[in-house]
Amino acid sequence: MRIGIVAGELSGDQLGGTLVEALKQKYPNAIIEGIGGPKMAAAGFKSLYPMDALSLIGFLEIISKGLRILSIRRKIINYFKQNKPDIFIGIDAPDFNLTVEKELRSAGIKTIHYVSPKIWVWREYRIKKIRKATDKILAILPFETEYYKNRHKFEAIYVGHPLAKNIPIHIDRAKYRDKLGLKGSSLPILSVLPGSRTTEVSRLLPLFLLALQKLVDAGYKFKAIMPLAKPSLKPLFAKYKEQIDSLGIEVFETNSHDVLKASDLSLLASGTATLEAMLCKLPMVVGYKLSWLSALIGRMLIGNHSYWAFPNILHKNEIIKELIQEDCTVDNLFSELKRLFDDKRRNDYIVEEFEKIHKEMVIDTESKIIQVLDTMIEKS
């Protein structure tokens, strides 16, 4: 059996890593190849091109690096047309993967898109391309199946999110503090996750650090910890080493899971990390900034969509504070961080609601995906 997979960024590599592990258990001799990151490679995946080349955000970055992406996309399409897989799975990265899927499907290859494009937020017109590109959408959010069915008469299958299964409902935080060498700390532990992409981190890290300094100056006592999302961010972190050190922030070259599981509270960028923090039952403050052009175009396409962060989308209310674009200022971050430390009753409520959502999301994701995959291959 031959299976093609393309993941475009770290969150896709996390999903792909657990999926490749499960596929290798079910089909030990399968050739599984395409584009992926370190977690997928560790599970036995062959990456034909570096995943980092696809990890872009914002319209300016796409314009500046777009030619390389287009070249890689054309090469991966040609490769799979010449080395036809039994099935192709595009993990997220819809702007890249839907075109790949469309071309491969037109060549007679079965295609799956894993992680629904957020057409319920913006660019709903993409449903036309989705219909042409993919045989099945695998949704990781519970409400998406009904959205596709009722609004677009298209089948999306809810497969859950692997994190909901892999992260326990009740976390032994002491275990992860011991693992990180934080044993015995009596201070509340605040995880700081300014993003996984260079552009995100360059915009958010300085703001986060200044807000934390104001928190310290106001007399708040805490221990801040931060994961290094990937080695390529080391030079950027080094640029702010003096501030990081003066705040006593410990930077760990480990995955975000361990850092979040060791934490009491979190300050982080909007994105998949907010889902992970929610499953770790962390009251949080979310910040995000795009370039002015990306923000302008994004707002034209999104309109007045209410929420950006996964906890708010899933809860259907602003259960945690989002500070987006011009609202993402040092003063606003500081104000919300103070609230995070001061309002225990609110934090207890947030934890209770996150636990309810977590329980609803638990499903054996990989087994469900393999079941879908088997059915599609049998019918072909």
UniProtKB/Swiss-Prot annotation:
Pfam families: LpxB. GO terms for biological process: lipid A biosynthetic process. CDD domains: Glycosyltransferase_GTB-type. Pathway: Bacterial outer membrane biogenesis; LPS lipid A biosynthesis. GO terms for molecular function: lipid-A-disaccharide synthase activity; phospholipid binding. The keyword Glycosyltransferase applies. Its EC number is 2.4.1.182. Gene3D superfamilies: Glycogen Phosphorylase B. One of its GO terms (cellular component) is membrane. It catalyses: a lipid X + a UDP-2-N,3-O-bis[(3R)-3-hydroxyacyl]-alpha-D-glucosamine = a lipid A disaccharide + UDP + H(+). Keywords: Glycosyltransferase, Lipid A biosynthesis, Lipid biosynthesis, Lipid metabolism, Transferase. It is an enzyme of class 2 (transferase). Belongs to the LpxB family. Condensation of UDP-2,3-diacylglucosamine and 2,3-diacylglucosamine-1-phosphate to form lipid A disaccharide, a precursor of lipid A, a phosphorylated glycolipid that anchors the lipopolysaccharide to the outer membrane of the cell. This is Lipid-A-disaccharide synthase.
